[in-house]
């Protein structure tokens, strides 16, 4: 239950932020260079998940990787935020390489591919063309999902498919993703986002696998929703509800749940 409760807290943070500012936080703020990256959506909602003291230390006009505690060299993003961690994930809470604290929860970029995929060729499926949505990894105006990596901020009015039919957030496994393992404070590329293109719990955790689809360096499959729960993963919907979707969910419907305004009817199991 705690994993679902964490997502509910994130949902309250998203909806309360929208209530104050009239739009949801950006999924990410990936600049045209590292110097122009800015903290993403999980930073924005810190005041709404009882972490206002940490939020006040952030400079929202500076790159995430430049953020340090005053007088130290410790990254603010190395602070473990328990609300952002699923207790079922037994991997370390921080990345041993960069020291950043993980998040098991990422925003939905919709049913379009999130990022170019130059690494780890996929032999079992071409997931970059599997989506109902467009390939639009840098969308700034009106992306397929509620969030994008380029600073787009959706309004409730933009979610014309209905809040109860649209995924806001879901689970990820940072150890299975070369982007998600950069932590909740990162903002580069696909960090902080996932797509409903890829089946729930599609395995991308084996660095030694000959099929690039199944490796964390595959920039497509690693950005799918996945968890340590048996048989599925938890998802936060726009109405604040948390639902467990199974791996056997109809895949076309799953993709449509990622899109905020495709006009397609869905029936949740």
Protein language model features and the residues they cover:
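Extracellular/periplasmic head regions of type IV pilus-like filament subunits
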Residues: 31-88, 152, 162
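Short, solvent-exposed loop/turn segments at the edges of secondary structure
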Residues: 38-41, 79-81, 100, 228-230, ...
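Short, solvent-exposed loop/turn and secondary-structure capping segments
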Residues: 3, 27-29, 57-60, 95-101, ...
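Residue-level detector of short, conserved catalytic/binding motifs and their immediate flanks
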Residues: 8, 43, 81-84, 103, ...
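Short, well-ordered junction/capping motifs at the entry into regular secondary structure
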Residues: 20-38, 74, 213-232
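Active-site-adjacent helix/loop patches that line small-molecule binding or acyl-intermediate pockets
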Residues: 87-97
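Conserved hydrophobic/amphipathic alpha-helical signal-anchor segments
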Residues: 1-57, 242
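Hydrophobic alpha-helical interface faces used for helix-helix packing
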Residues: 64-67, 90, 103, 108-269
């Amino acid at each position: 239950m705690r994993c679902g409760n964490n997502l509910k807290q994130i949902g309250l943070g998203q909806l309360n932020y929208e209530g104050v500012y009239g739009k949801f936080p950006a999924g990410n703020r990936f600049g045209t260079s590292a110097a122009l990256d800015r903290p993403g959506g999980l930073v924005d909602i810190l005041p709404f998940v009882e972490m206002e003291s940490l939020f006040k230390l952030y400079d929202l006009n500076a790159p995430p990787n430049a953020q340090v505690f005053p007088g130290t060299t410790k990254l603010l993003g190395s602070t473990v935020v328990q609300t952002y961690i699923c207790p079922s994930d037994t991997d370390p809470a921080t990345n041993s390489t960069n020291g950043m604290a993980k998040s098991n929860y990422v925003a939905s970029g919709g049913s379009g591919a999130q990022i170019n995929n130059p690494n780890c060729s996929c032999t079992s499926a071409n997931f970059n063309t599997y989506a109902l949505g467009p390939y639009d990894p840098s969308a700034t105006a009106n992306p397929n999902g509620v969030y994008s990596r380029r600073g787009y901020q959706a309004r409730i009015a933009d979610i014309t498919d209905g809040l109860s039919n649209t995924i806001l957030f879901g689970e990820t496994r940072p150890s299975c993703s070369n982007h998600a393992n950069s932590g909740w404070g990162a903002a580069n590329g696909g960090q902080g986002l996932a797509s409903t293109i890829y089946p729930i719990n599609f395995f991308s955790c084996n660095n030694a696998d000959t099929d690039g689809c199944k490796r964390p360096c595959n920039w497509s499959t690693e950005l799918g929703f996945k968890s340590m729960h048996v048989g599925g993963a938890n998802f936060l919907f726009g109405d604040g509800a948390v639902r467990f979707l199974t791996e056997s969910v109809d895949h076309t419907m799953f993709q449509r749940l990622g899109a905020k305004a495709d006009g397609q009817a869905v029936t949740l199991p």
